[in-house]
Design a protein with these regions (language model features):
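Short acidic active-site motifs
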Residues: 52-56, 77-80, 172, 176
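Redox-cofactor binding/interface segments in oxidoreductases and associated redox assembly factors
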Residues: 13, 70, 192
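Short beta-strand segments enriched in small/hydrophobic residues
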Residues: 3-19, 73, 119, 127-134
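Short, ordered loop/turn segments at secondary-structure junctions
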Residues: 46-48, 73, 95-96, 133
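Amphipathic helical "hinge" segments at domain boundaries
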Residues: 1-67, 145, 152
Length: 207
């Protein structure tokens, strides 16, 4: 009973960038499920991590949250594996970071990328570019692997020139698309690792 009285019935959801529309549907689903179980949801934006770090730590120390849900691949503050054991329960969703040793809910990024690239091939495209995310992120590694495997399955040689990288921002997508368009034989279709980069790529392609 004492434990029940000390519960805040509040979950902190850490979002890499609250401005990314990709997360809106995910957050809505989290809030609906949390409400059904009598929990409130706090949203923490990691886009300005240095400013927010103290706030997140204060919430934990003062026991104002019962759990954390990470939608990115990083903790919003430094904590060793040993220190993580003293934190509220944490689950990672959408991303995959083996080094954090957290329970994880995520999609099969390799298969999803393979299917997307294979679809482009079935539409008649042979020169398929890729705007990949940061190299250090596991999900980007798997998505790039899916891209490469799909091309090989379709009998298309992988051309490193057709792979550009960005940091999941609109501007990065735009720059990466321009890089691909500047090639002597630009791709006729492009597979993007994120919706926001895809929007930037589309904007650049229409200029």
């Amino acid at each position: 009973r004492n434990v029940k009285r000390n519960e805040s019935r509040t979950i902190l959801v850490i979002v890499p960038d609250i401005c990314d529309p990709f997360f809106s549907e995910i957050i809505r689903g989290i809030e609906v499920t949390a409400a059904n179980h009598g929990y409130l949801v706090l949203i923490g934006d990691c886009a300005h991590q240095n400013q927010q770090e103290k706030t997140f730590i204060d919430l934990i120390i003062t026991k104002q949250i019962d759990g954390m849900l990470l939608l990115g691949s990083r903790l919003p503050f430094d904590a060793s594996i040993e220190e993580q054991r003293n934190l509220p329960p944490m689950v990672m969703a959408n991303e995959f970071a083996p080094e954090l040793e957290l329970p994880t809910v995520h999609i099969d990024n390799l298969t999803a990328a393979f299917d997307a690239v294979n679809y482009l091939y079935e539409q008649g495209h042979k020169r398929i570019g890729c705007i990949a995310g940061p190299e250090e992120m596991p999900l980007c590694h798997y998505r790039l692997q899916g891209y490469v495997q799909a091309l090989r399955r379709c009998g298309i040689m992988v051309d490193p020139q057709y792979i550009a990288r960005g940091d999941f921002t609109f501007e990065a997508g735009s720059r990466a698309m321009q890089q691909l368009l500047d090639l002597p034989q630009p791709p006729t279709a492009v597979f993007c690792h994120s919706d926001v980069m895809a929007l930037g790529a589309l904007s650049q392609a229409k200029r």
